[in-house]
Amino acid sequence: MSLSLLFLIFCSHLIHSAWAHGEKRLTPEGQPAPPRNPGDSSGSRGRSSATFSSSSASSPVAASPGSQGSGSEHSSFQWSPSGRRTGSLYCRVGIGFHLQIYPDGKVNGSHEASVLSILEIFAVSQGIVGIRGVFSNKFLAMSKKGKLHASAKFTDDCKFRERFQENSYNTYASAIHRTEKTGREWYVALNKRGKAKRGCSPRVKPQHVSTHFLPRFKQSEQPELSFTVTVPEKKKPPVKPKVPLSQPRRSPSPVKYRLKFRFG
């Protein structure tokens, strides 16, 4: 009788523990939890408010990837800073002049560099560039009559073909204007006084120094890269000890005998 009673108590204990374990599993998954005391209402409200605040705080974070994506799409349509070169164009004609672009549309050269001579050269297509004055914020252009001027808007007149010469100078020819009969290109040029020459002039040729410009750009400081090169060296032969050389013996000076003749 005692064994059967103990067996029943053991089975009831197992059933009770299994039921309690199953209830704990169901509660975190959204199943209705056992009823709580009315005094815990304030705690539940506090927890609900904390949950709402955390969800509201996480909402801008979720929205941030969209904003970042729109920014990346917008930045893809902008000019790449690596495609722009800022500096000056130095023409070696006469005493040497820096190309200048004025806010009023005038273009000429000055021997001394100034803020008007700071230019920005950017690529438009393969071999075609545009030149903009940083201070005047206007583009270098050549009219259909070959006259150089500054334009507030970037048009086809502002496109120039950049070529590199063998003497490390560059030439800039209009991309659309040229002589119709001969097909001769019109180049950007300055005379000996620093005034802009007409590109249609027959004297403006790519071989003349008036069309040669030396780009002077500011190079960004790059960190110095150092490395060590090891060259295999041949083993030097062991140094032999110096043996003092024996001085040659001096031969004794010959003895001279004088013959004496005696006559009886």
UniProtKB/Swiss-Prot annotation:
One of its GO terms (cellular component) is extracellular region. Its main location: secreted. Residues 1-20 form the signal peptide. Glycans are attached at N108. One of its GO terms (biological process) is positive regulation of cell population proliferation. Residues 38-72 have a biased composition (Low complexity). SUPFAM superfamilies: Cytokine (SSF50353). GO terms for molecular function: fibroblast growth factor receptor binding; growth factor activity. Residues 25-81, 227-254 are annotated as: Disordered. InterPro entries: Fibroblast_GF_fam, IL1/FGF. It is found in: Secreted. Keywords: Glycoprotein, Growth factor, Mitogen, Secreted, Signal. Interacts with FGFR1 and FGFR2. Affinity between fibroblast growth factors (FGFs) and their receptors is increased by heparan sulfate glycosaminoglycans that function as coreceptors. Belongs to the heparin-binding growth factors family. Plays an important role in the regulation of cell proliferation and cell differentiation. Required for normal regulation of the hair growth cycle. Functions as an inhibitor of hair elongation by promoting progression from anagen, the growth phase of the hair follicle, into catagen the apoptosis-induced regression phase. This is Fibroblast growth factor 5. It comes from Mus musculus (Mouse).
